[in-house]
Amino acid sequence: MLIKRSDLNPILKPKRIHSWEAEAVFNGCPIRKDNKIYLVYRALSLPHYHTLANTNLMVSDIGIAPSKDGIEFHDRKRFIAPEHPWERFGCEDPRVTELEGKYYIFYTALSAYPFRAE
């Protein structure tokens, strides 16, 4: 197998107009469904004051973007954002698995600051 890097790299860049993905976008997981490719990816926000950490932090959300060709992604949306105590400091590094017609997403959730394994 030969893998060739796209001449259009990077295929996804931060979008300053979306504060939730304005700092960085990376670690994507592509999914093919219904003749489209969806990229589920980690999105890093601009630094902002986080009251629970008592400091400025960049928080990760998970975004999703569809594509017809796997290179040009449009209509990007926030897919998963921290809303539970166990993910209050970020949702990161998504992985998606399709099993018997259902899609399951796994991701890292950050519940503490400074970050540590629990």
Locate the predicted segments by residue.
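Beta-rich carbohydrate-recognition and catalytic domains
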Residues: M1-E23, N27-F89, T97-E118
